[in-house]
Swiss-Prot record:
GO terms classed as biological process: translation
Protein name: Large ribosomal subunit protein uL24
UniProt keyword annotation of Phosphoprotein present: no
Keywords: Ribonucleoprotein, Ribosomal protein, RNA-binding, rRNA-binding
Function: One of two assembly initiator proteins, it binds directly to the 5'-end of the 23S rRNA, where it nucleates assembly of the 50S subunit. One of the proteins that surrounds the polypeptide exit tunnel on the outside of the subunit.
Pfam families found in the cross-reference section: KOW, ribosomal_L24
Subunit structure as annotated in this protein's UniProt entry: Part of the 50S ribosomal subunit.
Top-level taxon of origin: Bacteria
InterPro entries per the UniProt record, alphabetical: KOW, Rib_uL2_dom2, Ribosomal_uL24, Ribosomal_uL24_KOW, Translation_prot_SH3-like_sf
Molecular function per GO: rRNA binding; structural constituent of ribosome
GO CC annotations, alphabetized: ribonucleoprotein complex; ribosome
HAMAP family xrefs: Ribosomal_uL24_B
Presence of keyword Ribonucleoprotein: yes
């Protein structure tokens, strides 16, 4: 089970300060998780400029130009934001047994290390 999932609110904890044009301290929602490369795509964070070649689409409209998109950032550079305190926190797990259809299953529940509450 991943500590950071799609839809979580995270805060950038490393990198250049905001005064210098960086993203440290900014918060954003996780748009996508790349588990094979340990990276996450965060809304409004690590924006890069992409230049694409000018061409024509099938409908005859012009394509290409300069666009600004988000690039993935490494998981170690972000921290999950605790929903109750709105501050970055570490994530732990708590094992809980759930009974469903007569069978008991053990599930892992994400817990904030700072407050001890479920996330």
């Amino acid at each position: 089970m991943a500590k950071i999932k799609k839809g979580d609110l995270v805060q950038v904890i490393t990198g250049a300060k905001q005064e210098r044009g960086g993203d440290r301290g900014k918060q954003g929602k996780v748009l996508r998780v790349f588990p094979d490369t340990n990276r996450v795509l965060v809304e409004g964070i690590n924006r890069v400029t992409k230049h694409s070649k000018v061409g024509q689409s099938q409908r005859g409209t012009k394509t290409g130009g300069i666009e600004v998109v988000e690039a993935p950032i490494h998981v170690s550079n972000v921290a999950l934001v605790d929903p109750s305190t709105k501050k970055p926190t570490r994530v732990g797990f708590r094992l809980d047994t759930v009974e469903k259809d007569g069978a008991t299953k053990t599930v892992r529940i994400r817990v904030s290390k700072a407050t001890g509450k479920d996330i």
